[in-house]
C-alpha cells in the first residue's frame, strides 16, 4: 500500500532574505533616523557633529546595552549594512563633487591638498609604528581619517585593510575629538592673526588652509562659517578636493598592501594578489558624471540625502559591533598619535599653505 508523505515546501527566497536582513537593517535605520534628527539641531550643527558621527555614537551605546539580546535576529542585517551599504554610500558620495570645484580652487589648492594629505599619512605611519608601536590597521585608519576626510575616509579604508570594528571605532573617535577641537581653534587663530598680522592670510587663503587641514566636511563647514563667507566657500571647495583624492588613495593603498603581502609571504605574484576597491573607481566615475550636470539639481540633492542615510546606517552598524572594552584596550597611544597629527596639520599645514601660495605668486 502506497503511503503519501507530506513534504514541507521551501520558503520563498524573498521571505528568507527578509527574515535574515530586515531586522538588522531596521535597527540601523532607526539609529540613523535618530542621528539625522539630532544632527539637525542648532547646537550639534554649531559643534560640527553630523549624522555620521552621531550614528556611530548612538550605535555604540545601543551595541553595548540592548544589542546583545537583539544580535541573534539582527546580526545579518547589521553586517550587510556595515559592508555593502558602506560601499554604496562611498559610490554615491561622488555626487557631492564636480570637477568644476577643482577648477575653482585651481592648481594651488590641489597641490596644497596633495602635499598635506601625503605628508600627514606618511607621518602617521612613521609615528604610529616607530614611536608608538601601534599595529598597521590602527595607524593607517587614523592616518586616513586625519589626512583625507575623517570618518568617511576611515570607513572607506576599512574594507581595504579588512580592519577590526574596534580599531575603526578608535580611529573615528580621534577624528571626532580633534576635528571638533578644530572648530573652535581655527576661528580663534584667524582672529588672532587678523589682529597681529603674523602671517599673510586673507579670509579666502585662510579658508583654503582650513579646508586642507580640518578632518570632517561638517567640521570644515562649521569652522569656515565662523570665520566668514569667503573663508567658508574656499574651505568647502578645498575640502571637496581632498575628498576626491580618497579614491586614488584607496587604489594606491590597495596596491601597496598587495605588494607587501607578496613580499612578506614570499609567494609568486598573481593577478589576484592586488585587490582593486572597485567602489573607489566607481566613486570617481560618479563625480565625473555629476560634473556633466545631466541630472536635475533636485535629483542630485535626493541622491546626496540617500548617500547620507546609507553612510549613517553603515556607521550605526559599526557602532553596534564595537565593544567599549576593546576601545579601552587600545589605550592612550592612538589618541597621542592623533594629537601629534593634529599639531602637524596646524603647524605643517600652515607651512605648506604659505610655501605653495608663495611659489604661485613668483
Swiss-Prot record:
This is UPF0324 membrane protein YPO1307/y2878/YP_1285. PANTHER family: INNER MEMBRANE PROTEIN YEIH-RELATED (PTHR30106), UPF0324 INNER MEMBRANE PROTEIN YEIH (PTHR30106:SF2). Belongs to the UPF0324 family. It comes from the Bacteria. It comes from Yersinia pestis. The keyword Transmembrane helix applies. Pfam families: Cons_hypoth698. NCBIfam families: YeiH family putative sulfate export transporter.
